[in-house]
Swiss-Prot record:
It comes from Homo sapiens. Its EC number is 2.8.1.7. This is Cysteine desulfurase. [2Fe-2S] cluster binds at residue 381. Active only in complex with LYRM4. It is linked to Combined oxidative phosphorylation deficiency 52: An autosomal recessive mitochondrial disorder with onset in infancy, characterized by lactic acidemia, hypotonia, respiratory chain complex II and III deficiency, multisystem organ failure and abnormal mitochondria.
Length: 457
């Protein structure tokens, strides 16, 4: 009691200490291009430097990289950041019981979204860890009998790197090519399965081009051949309907910050019946049924659960709205600009992820010109590289077009005005950059660029 009283006095003292009055919280504030960032949103050193000037907040159109935290999710998390701070694994007092109850409620919310049993949900730090557990965990557990895995050339980097790591351990991995649409050939998948294949890993929605793989068909093939099926559903959960039983999915990776939840938390679904055995990657206290040791962060899993519940309630509405905005963006850009290519299959496609290539324009130059809009040229995990996207190369995109691609992300909080502004600025800067391009000038003069023999100096 004395310690608690002292803590309260210290908190009051800090609150009452003289100094500048703190700025009002900015939660829920939508900033648009041209707005000045609130003083509380400016770093202290920037705010103190008069030569820096006003700070502009660009429009956010990069929801494949991450999504903003839904205010309803934050409301659910706050009590577990402030009052209910017990360790959910401490089962001898009320603090632990409160946190454990919240953790299990979140587990139920995640399971409900994908049609799973709550006991099949294991909390992790995010989709990268979930993918590592699924791929390495299954491969290593069954290594005595099965040493072959199958994945695709367009998977997320953490899946590809996990497979390469297993190859260094002596496993054999088949990397299936994709068609120009970005979708795998199911006949090639069937032909690739061997008697010693333990796992097939195919992502649900591609993070760069938004293509949806035929997950239910893949699940049926794997089930009939008695091979476990894992899907990285980070870009799909909460955005399109998924049912792990109907689709015969054995393992699924989920990310919190891709569905308007907090960063640093995710989950992996691991089927119980028939049971999928996984070798744990880390040692410790045996939390999460021994599959993922470490104290579960209650506020984060509460946020993940709340995000899943909101997504389940609003999925149909969000999808219709995002589809309309996506159609608006694509049509308005393509009717105003020639030589624009949409990458990936337009029919089997999640509408919130649009990847366009603007011929005769360098993607990095266009990104720099569109400084008022937060966009990406591809995956946030590989966008620091100047190499063309391996996903675009895999679908047969010419290197020049691959270098000219921009990914537009439309999400729950994207407005029609933001889409129109992005379209307007995109058209303006593509036209300006093309006017500066000698290649564009040659094309306008009717010269076939492929007929030119370039020489090095």
């Amino acid at each position: 009691m004395l310690l608690r009283a002292a803590w309260r006095r210290a908190a009051v003292a800090v609150t009452a200490a003289p100094g500048p009055k703190p700025a009002a919280p900015t939660r829920g504030l939508r900033l648009r291009v041209g707005d000045r960032a609130p003083q509380s949103a400016v770093p202290a050193d920037t705010a103190a430097a008069p030569e820096v000037g006003p700070v502009l907040r660009p429009l956010y159109m990069d929801v494949q990289a991450t999504t903003p935290l839904d205010p309803r999710v934050l409301d659910a998390m706050l009590p577990y950041l402030i009052n209910y701070y017990g360790n959910p694994h401490s089962r001898t007092h009320a603090y632990g019981w409160e946190s454990e109850a919240a953790m299990e409620r979140a587990r139920q919310q995640v399971a409900s979204l994908i049609g799973a049993d709550p006991r099949e949900i294991i909390f992790t730090s995010g989709a990268t860890e979930s993918n590592n557990i699924a791929i390495k965990g299954v491969a290593r557990f069954y290594r005595s009998r099965k040493k072959h895995l199958i994945t695709t050339q367009t998977e997320h980097k953490c899946v590809l790197d996990s497979c390469r790591s297993l190859e260094a351990e002596g496993f054999q991995v088949t990397y299936l090519p994709v068609q120009k649409s970005g979708i795998i050939d199911l006949k090639e998948l069937e032909a690739a399965i061997q008697p010693d294949t333990s796992l097939v890993s195919v992502m649900t929605v591609n993070n760069e081009i938004g293509v949806k793989q035929p997950i239910a068909e893949i699940g049926r093939i794997c089930s009939s051949r008695k091979v476990y099926f894992h899907t990285d559903a980070a870009q799909a959960v909460g955005k399109i309907p998924l049912d792990v039983n109907d689709m015969k999915i054995d393992l699924m990776s989920i990310s919190g910050h891709k569905i308007y939840g907090p960063k640093g938390v995710g989950a992996i679904y691991i089927r119980r019946r028939p049971r999928v055995r996984v070798e744990a990657l880390q040692s410790g206290g045996g939390q999460e049924r021994g599959m993922r040791s470490g104290t579960v962060p209650t506020p984060l899993v509460v946020g993940l659960g709340a995000a899943c519940e909101v997504a389940q309630q609003e999925m149909e509405y969000d999808h219709k709205r995002i589809s309309k905005l996506s159609e608006r963006l694509i049509q308005n850009i393509m009717k105003s600009l020639p030589d624009v290519v949409m990458n990936g299959d337009p029919k089997h496609h999640y509408p919130g992820c649009i990847n366009l290539s603007f011929a005769y324009v360098e993607g990095e130059s266009l990104l720099m010109a569109l400084k008022d809009v937060a966009l990406s040229s591809g995956s946030a995990c590989t966008s620091a590289s100047l190499e063309p996207s391996y996903v675009l190369r895999a679908i047969g995109t010419d290197e020049d077009l691959a270098h000219s691609s921009i990914r537009f992300g439309i999400g729950r909080f994207t407005t029609e005005e933001e889409v129109d502004y992005t379209v307007e600025k995109c058209i303006q800067h593509v036209k300006r950059l093309r006017e500066m391009s000698p290649l564009w000038e040659m094309v306008q003069d009717g010269i076939d660029l492929k007929s030119i023999k370039w020489t090095q100096h």
